[in-house]
UniProtKB/Swiss-Prot annotation:
The lineage of its organism: Eukaryota, Fungi, Dikarya, Ascomycota, Pezizomycotina. It is an enzyme of class 1 (oxidoreductase). The gene is qutB. It catalyses: L-quinate + NAD(+) = 3-dehydroquinate + NADH + H(+). The keyword Secreted does not apply. This is Quinate dehydrogenase. It comes from Emericella nidulans (strain FGSC A4 / ATCC 38163 / CBS 112.46 / NRRL 194 / M139). InterPro entries: Aminoacid_DH-like_N_sf, NAD(P)-bd_dom_sf, Shikimate_DH-bd_N, Shikimate_DH_fam.
Length: 329
């Protein structure tokens, strides 16, 4: 376990809390923002990774005790394995964190009585939302009243469901996943959080069923880039393929957000979608927008409106991913 560093040469410090932290873009992304804003801040990862070994990040009690007594602390990114476990230990949670079922960001909120609240939120919601809105041909209108599709059964799927419902106004959400139990868990959790949802979740596990349903206009894929091997994986991939190929007969071009961008930004699913004439949005776009939302919460500045800042962050991320793709890190 790495000690929690408080840098003496910086005015503010954010942390990246989790493990293993291999090739994370978060610290350099935030440094790009801080430099552009003229802030003497930094973000420090709380674990290290080399080869196949890594150091563990501190336990939650140790971490929170340290940051609560750190006058330079401005906020923290939170990643696995702490995104769910940390939630009950914080002073408050935003609706985004509660509905997504995970916290990826801690920020400070001053109360009227002068006390500081340590608040958990989920900026992945903003990342997915902005990636879809910025990448769609006509903004939110592209999605309203039309079906969307989620690929996967993990945290990304849960977050995407919330985003599609809250901000994009879709009519229904199909779920395609290899593991039926994961889908059942999503449905059970959703029923508990939203007893009377306006937008239904529709599991689809068979290509023939996909062929009879209204074609989606948006897809969020949140699975690793591995070739399907098992019968369930092959069926799920073929179900997705049927959905994607149907959109060529629709008036509007579909958009797909491929959240997997490591180790390579272009995945098998991205290629299938492009071949079916979908517009592919790389997952790095969601990374950028969620990072900018973190920076807004930590700095208190409207970072997106800062001239040239978004472009600097986009250029940095694009260059870094391109370099890593060449070396296949």
């Amino acid at each position: 376990m790495e000690p929690i560093t408080i840098p003496t040469d910086r005015d503010g410090v954010a942390y990246l809390y989790g493990h293993p932290l291999r090739n994370s873009l978060s610290p350099p992304l935030h440094q790009t923002v801080y430099n552009a804003l003229g802030l003497n801040w930094t973000q420090i990862p709380l674990s290290t990774a080399t080869g196949t070994s890594f150091t563990r990040s501190p336990e939650i009690s140790t971490f929170l005790s340290s940051v609560r007594s750190n006058p330079k602390f401005v906020g923290s990114s939170v990643t696995m394995p702490w995104k769910v476990a940390i939630m009950p230990h914080l002073d408050d949670l935003t609706e985004d964190a509660r509905q997504a079922g995970a916290c990826n960001t801690i920020y400070l909120r001053k109360e009227d009585d002068g006390k500081t609240q340590y608040v958990g939120t989920n900026t992945d919601c903003i990342g997915i939302r902005e990636a879809l809105l910025q990448g769609s041909p006509n903004g939110a209108e592209h999605f309203k009243g039309k079906p969307a599709l989620i690929v996967g059964g993990g945290g990304t799927a849960r977050t995407a469901i919330y985003v599609l419902r809250k901000w994009l106004g879709v009519s229904k959400i199909y779920i395609v996943n290899r593991d039926a139990k994961e889908v059942e868990a999503i449905l059970a959790e959703d029923k508990q959080r939203n007893p009377s949802p306006q937008v239904a979740l529709v599991p689809v596990s068979d290509p023939s069923a996909a062929a009879t349903l209204e074609a989606p206009v948006a897809v969020v894929s949140g699975i690793p880039n591995y070739p399907p091997q098992t019968e369930e994986e092959i069926r799920a991939r073929e179900t997705l393929r049927v959905f994607l190929n149907r959109q060529t007969h629709e008036k509007d071009q579909g958009v797909i957000l491929e959240m997997c961008y490591h180790p390579l930004p272009w995945t098998d699913i991205a290629q299938i979608a492009q071949d079916a004439r979908w517009k592919v949005i790389l997952g790095s776009e969601a990374l950028i927008w969620q990072g900018l939302e973190q920076a807004r919460l930590w700095t208190g500045k409207d970072v997106v409106s800062e001239p040239g800042l978004v472009e600097k962050v986009q250029a940095f991320v694009a260059q870094t991913i391109a370099e890593r793709s060449k070396s296949n890190l």
